[in-house]
Amino acid sequence: MESQQLSQHSPNSHGSACASVTSKEVHTNQDPLDVSASKTEECEKASTKANSQQTTTPASSAVPENPHHASPQPASVPPPQNGPYPQQCMMTQNQANPSGWSFYGHPSMIPYTPYQMSPMYFPPGPQSQFPQYPSSVGTPLSTPSPESGNTFTDSSSADSDMTSTKKYVRPPPMLTSPNDFPNWVKTYIKFLQNSNLGGIIPTVNGKPVRQITDDELTFLYNTFQIFAPSQFLPTWVKDILSVDYTDIMKILSKSIEKMQSDTQEANDIVTLANLQYNGSTPADAFETKVTNIIDRLNNNGIHINNKVACQLIMRGLSGEYKFLRYTRHRHLNMTVAELFLDIHAIYEEQQGSRNSKPNYRRNPSDEKNDSRSYTNTTKPKVIARNPQKTNNSKSKTARAHNVSTSNNSPSTDNDSISKSTTEPIQLNNKHDLHLRPETY
């Protein structure tokens, strides 16, 4: 037994004995910490008897390989792995802890901020492998915010009063291409709104509702750096960051301006494709409207040539302007200015014809007097509609005419008038029509 051999040596030979033991080669794959308790106690007793006053020399780097070493050292724990995210996606200690926040090693674990942000942000995919912050960290999320995202707490209020809209706020996706930045920044702005930071987002005039705090600026910088890697940023974003790498607010302001410009472009295209003109508005106003739209689109990189513009304009013409589609649609070299010359000519002709017409109205009393003084020179023909009517049904004018003619001079006309109405009446007209009572 080696332990008995160690007890027989003198104190002076303890060093050589230890050297012989440590220099002995042990061909084994046994864990250096897997040593039985009995062997460990025997070694400790032998070492104490051999040298009770001399301190034990620390083991060398080769000692953990010896299973008989008396004082095992704790094994070093390897640093935790960072999951599927590469090392370059992590922020440094100085970047992640600028204002006293605890260091976080995983990009999905956004720091629990003083203004009650969500304690954990989950990236897309399985979430069971990612640890969560304990429930004791920070203040519990007790008072939810409005769902609208447009009403935000004032920065002058206490930090504890600012709570997150949801317990877990969905983070924006990772930016993977410079072409996807316009769509990505929309989701990032929505992420800030859900995190009670809508008040720091620039408005239409380029100014935020309230002043951003230092902690909020740090959070803005950290989240932008995590979810928008620098290699996928557009050139204009890199130019801003090259001047000031923390000026995320300027990037958001420029992005909002570009969104408004894109919206204006879409509206201009829709307006140009749905033009309508019939002369109800001045031709000058119509021309100004169309030319301004074409100029804005050309300035924004959407070029509208004369052929396309003329086709869109002529398609919306109606009324007297409609014939312009057929008179000049074959002219390939026609410009917008030439088309508007024709439109102006038709409009001026319409205005001239309207001005030449009398614009006065006759007095109603004059019309009444004219109707009274009007005399009918033609003698209307009398046609019996009902043969069963008696002579009393004749008009007063006919009876007066019969009386006057019978008193003055008798003639054959009187006999024709006194004839029965049941006889057919012959009309003196060119068609020689006859009306019979039984056929009427």
From Swiss-Prot:
One of its GO terms (cellular component) is cytoplasm. Residues 153-165, 402-418 have a biased composition (Low complexity). GO terms for biological process: viral translational frameshifting. GO terms for molecular function: RNA binding. Residues 429-440 have a biased composition (Basic and acidic residues). Residues 299-401 are annotated as: RNA-binding. It comes from the Eukaryota. Keywords: Cytoplasm, Phosphoprotein, RNA-binding, Transposable element. Residues 1-23, 48-60, 127-152, 419-428 have a biased composition (Polar residues). The record marks H401, N402 as: Cleavage. The keyword GTP-binding does not apply. The modification Phosphoserine is found at S416. Residues 1-93, 126-173, 352-440 are annotated as: Disordered. Its main location: cytoplasm. Homotrimer. Capsid protein (CA) is the structural component of the virus-like particle (VLP), forming the shell that encapsulates the retrotransposons dimeric RNA genome. The particles are assembled from trimer-clustered units and there are holes in the capsid shells that allow for the diffusion of macromolecules. CA also has nucleocapsid-like chaperone activity, promoting primer tRNA(i)-Met annealing to the multipartite primer-binding site (PBS), dimerization of Ty1 RNA and initiation of reverse transcription. Retrotransposons are mobile genetic entities that are able to replicate via an RNA intermediate and a reverse transcription step. In contrast to retroviruses, retrotransposons are non-infectious, lack an envelope and remain intracellular. Ty1 retrotransposons belong to the copia elements (pseudoviridae). The C-terminal RNA-binding region of CA is sufficient for all its nucleocapsid-like chaperone activities. This is Transposon TyH3 Gag polyprotein. It comes from Saccharomyces cerevisiae (Baker's yeast).
